[in-house]
C-alpha cells in the first residue's frame, strides 16, 4: 500500500515538471492564491491554526491531523469513562500483546488481543463510543496511558496489533526486532496470508523510539499492521457489536500463526515451555 502511494506521488511530481508554468491565466490564479494566503496568515485567529498545521506537516512525529487528543490525559479529561475500556493481563515478562487502538478505532484488533490474552500478557485500549470511536485514537508515539507504560516496563518483547485502511487482504510487519519480524512474516505467508516485512524507516514500521510498543524493558518490538479487508475476513459480522462471537476460521488461523510464533521464538528460545 505504501509503495503504491509513493508511486502515485512520483507520477504527480513528474507531471508537474512537464507542465507549462507560463501564461496569463496561471499568473492570475497564482496571484489570487497568494492574496488569499496573505489574508489568512494576517488573521489573528487563523495564524495559530496555520502554524500548528505547518508544524504537523513537517514534523512526522507530531500529532496526526486525525487525532483529537495529543495524549491520554487530554482524552481522560474530556471523555466519559464509559466511552472507552482498558484490559490488562500479566502472565509473565517474556511477551506483551499490545492493542492501543481497539474497539471501534481499528476494528478487529480488540478481538485478536483478547484471544491472545488467554495465554499471554496483554494490554488493550478500546474505543467504545458510537459514533465517534475514531476520535479516541491517540497515535502510538503519543500514547501514554499509565497502565500501558507500567505493564510495558515489566516485559521484554512487545507484539503490537494495529489496523490500516486497505481493500487488500494484507499484513505489514514492522518493529525494532528485525529478526523476529522477519520470522513472523514468513510464518504468515507460509500459512497462506499475504504479508510483507517493512523497511525500518517505513511510516508504519513502528521503529520510532517514542512508539509505545518500544517502551518495554528492552526496546524490542514487532508491529503488525493488518489491513481492513484482512480484518473483515476474520469475522462473519464486522461491526463493533457484531464481531464478538462471530470470529471464523480465518480469525483462528491467524491466531494460530501468532501463537506458533510466540511459542517457538519466545518461549522455546528461552528454554521455557509455553
UniProtKB/Swiss-Prot annotation:
Coiled coil: none annotated. Gene3D superfamilies: Poly-gamma-glutamate hydrolase, zinc-binding motif. InterPro entries: Gamma_PGA_hydro, Gamma_PGA_hydro_sf. It holds the Pfam family Gamma_PGA_hydro. GO terms for molecular function: hydrolase activity. Belongs to the UPF0714 family. This is SPbeta prophage-derived UPF0714 protein YoqZ. It comes from Bacillus subtilis (strain 168). The lineage of its organism: Bacteria, Bacillati, Bacillota, Bacilli, Bacillales.
Amino acid at each position: 500500500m505504501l509503495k503504491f502511494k509513493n508511486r502515485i506521488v512520483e507520477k504527480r511530481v513528474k507531471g508537474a515538471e512537464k507542465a507549462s508554468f507560463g501564461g496569463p491565466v496561471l499568473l492570475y490564479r497564482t496571484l489570487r492564491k497568494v492574496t488569499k494566503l496573505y489574508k489568512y496568515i494576517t488573521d489573528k485567529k487563523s495564524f495559530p491554526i496555520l502554524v500548528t498545521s505547518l508544524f504537523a506537516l513537517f514534523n512526522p512525529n507530531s500529532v496526526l491531523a486525525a487525532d483529537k487528543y495529543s495524549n491520554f490525559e487530554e482524552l481522560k479529561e474530556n471523555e466519559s469513562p464509559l466511552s472507552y475500556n482498558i484490559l490488562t493481563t500479566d502472565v509473565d515478562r517474556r511477551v506483551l500483546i499490545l492493542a492501543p487502538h481497539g474497539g471501534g478505532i481499528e476494528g478487529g484488533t480488540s478481538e485478536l488481543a483478547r484471544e491472545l490474552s488467554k495465554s499471554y500478557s496483554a494490554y488493550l485500549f478500546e474505543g467504545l463510543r458510537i459514533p465517534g470511536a475514531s476520535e479516541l485514537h491517540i497515535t502510538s508515539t503519543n500514547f501514554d496511558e499509565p497502565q500501558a507504560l507500567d505493564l510495558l516496563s515489566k516485559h521484554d518483547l512487545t507484539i503490537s496489533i494495529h489496523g490500516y485502511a486497505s481493500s487488500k487482504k494484507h499484513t505489514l510487519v514492522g518493529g525494532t526486532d528485525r529478526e523476529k519480524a522477519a520470522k513472523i512474516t514468513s510464518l504468515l505467508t507460509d500459512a497462506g496470508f499475504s504479508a510483507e516485512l517493512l523497511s525500518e524507516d517505513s511510516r508504519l514500521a513502528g521503529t520510532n523510539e517514542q512508539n509505545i510498543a518500544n517502551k518495554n524493558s528492552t526496546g524490542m518490538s514487532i508491529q503488525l499492521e493488518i489491513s481492513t479487508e484482512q480484518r473483515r475476513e476474520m469475522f462473519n459480522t464486522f461491526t463493533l457489536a457484531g464481531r464478538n462471537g462471530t470470529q471464523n476460521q480465518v480469525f483462528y488461523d491467524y491466531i494460530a500463526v501468532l501463537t506458533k510464533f510466540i511459542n517457538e521464538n519466545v518461549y522455546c528460545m528461552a528454554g521455557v515451555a509455553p
